[in-house]
Amino acid sequence: MKNNSVVLTESLSIPEKLSYFNEDDKNDYEILAKKFREKKIKHIVTVARGTSDCAALFVSYMFAKCLGITTYSLPPSLITLENANFDFNNTLVIIITQSGLSQDLIACESAVKAMGAETLVITNNLKSELINSGTYFYNINAGEERSVAATKTFVLTLAIIIKLMSTILLKKNVLINLLELPNLLQKEIDNNWDHEIIEKKISSGFIISRGIGFALSNEIALKFKELCQEQIEPYSSAEVMHGPKSLIDNTFKIFTLSLNDNSGSVVIKDTNEIKQKTKHLYEITSNSHLDTRLLFTKNKFSELDPLTIMTKFYPWIIKYSLAKGMDPDTPRYLSKVTKTF
């Protein structure tokens, strides 16, 4: 097994990177928070691809849930291929791009501003032209991410969104707990999941969740494809019941992710039904008695649980990839900057 994996090193650095981010954060959350409180922003539109699009799904659900704002994920092709026009007055378009170099996202940012939108650019690249063109800019500040597979930038993007939402809602206790979180994350990594409990011979299945957890399940599914060449598909546990559950048997492996919020109890209920259909079931949860449980320590504020889950997940999936004899530093056919338009 490879011992000097770049992506593993980066994933293990997440607690340290979050601590540094907290200490050095110069992002102006209050300027946007004030606009939201004054109801000057009526709609949220996100534009992103890959792992950043999984973060955008997190954005969409959180803003809709917490603020009652309509949210929409804009396919870049509507701008770059179809030349579609929209009325984006009173709309904040959030562009999330770790590299800051995707030409389709750069084109979208310019186009939506011409349609009346204000834009928030969230990137890890201080040399990106988007920094100067965006109405607002938030720095992910994760340090250089050398690996093809994004890890630390995803977690810090979620932290940015949680900080913005907590500032809007004046949840000072969440912000205080976020400052203390790196210590907990380090303990969680030091007591991480056992990758050896996963059935390596099965390469297809589902990752099932609801609510905010569904955004995480999309990123988890992407990493199974990217690093392990396994076709694990993300589903809402409700949508699974509308047809896909017909696929489930002992040739499938199922991961379920339940958070400590309103969605969690529903996922647990659906998990109990799925248990009867396959012996390859793995629960990502803070409370389970299964031998195949993947436990995380719940936070005082459930808003922070996604950071804990993903901080544990990344080193675990990378070690699983290595155990399968793969090289997670060089995912097949992939490169750091994907050129699409």
Name each model feature, range by range.
Residues 2-8, 20, 134, 159, ...:
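Phosphate-moiety recognition in structured ligand-binding domains
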Residues 55, 59, 156-161, 216, ...:
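Catalytic-loop motifs flanking and including active-site residues across diverse enzymes
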Residues 9, 16, 23, 56-57, ...:
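A broad, structural surface signal
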Residues 30, 37-183, 190-191, 210, ...:
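Glycine-rich phosphate-binding loops that contact phosphosugars or nucleotide phosphates
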Residues 18, 58-61, 193, 313:
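Tryptophan-centered motif/residue detector
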